[in-house]
């Protein structure tokens, strides 16, 4: 048998096997059903921030100023968080201020939700940690059974809760009240914020 024929007999099965392997991956692709969860009221920005094993979602609804609708880094005018449970949206409320939001927050399998909320108290240092331009104190929160309560900080005025697991452990950051000396002059959000876990 010639070398060319042996090479052909070797290559054809390998090429066929690779082609069939690629084809089977294409056929086995998962298909998805996409559902529009909608926005609330006059809000123009809506985002599902988290999904638990029950199919419940944490939904953020926010507004951006005119002309900044396509700029996700823009100043937020307003924000609310909702728990979407089987298609019914429940407003999680606030801690006394106007706005609530989350950092890719979390809803665990028990329906506990974390995020951050403005209080009615102006920040004594003029910080705007919640990012709504109100300069109100921004506190991390835990919502259980649709009842929101503030989580403590590390001695500072502000913080944010980012995620919660099924053991009820919460992570985020909290200020310790100390001035961050590395901030340049004129920076308003100038306090030290440390990673935190609430257990």
Give short role names for the model-derived ranges.
Residues 2-199:
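Residue-level hotspots at or immediately adjacent to binding/recognition sites across diverse folds
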């Amino acid at each position: 048998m010639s070398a060319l024929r042996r090479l052909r007999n070797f290559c054809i099965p390998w090429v066929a096997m690779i082609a069939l392997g690629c084809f089977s991956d294409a056929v086995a692709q998962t298909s998805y059903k996409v559902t529009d969860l909608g926005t609330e009221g006059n809000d123009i920005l809506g985002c599902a921030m988290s999904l638990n094993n029950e199919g419940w979602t944490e939904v953020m609804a926010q507004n951006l100023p005119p002309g900044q609708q396509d700029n996700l880094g823009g100043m937020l005018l307003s924000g609310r968080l909702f728990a979407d449970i089987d298609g019914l949206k429940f407003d999680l409320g606030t801690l006394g201020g106007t706005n609530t939001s989350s950092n890719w927050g979390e809803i665990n399998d028990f329906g506990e939700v974390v995020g951050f909320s403005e209080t009615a108290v102006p920040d004594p240092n003029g910080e705007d940690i919640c990012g709504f331009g109100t300069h109100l104190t921004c506190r991390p929160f835990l919502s259980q059974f649709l009842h929101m309560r503030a989580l403590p900080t590390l001695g500072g005025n502000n913080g944010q809760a980012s995620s919660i697991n099924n053991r009820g452990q919460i992570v985020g950051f909290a200020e310790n009240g100390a001035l961050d000396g590395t901030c340049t002059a004129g920076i308003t959000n100038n306090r030290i914020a440390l990673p935190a876990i609430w257990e």
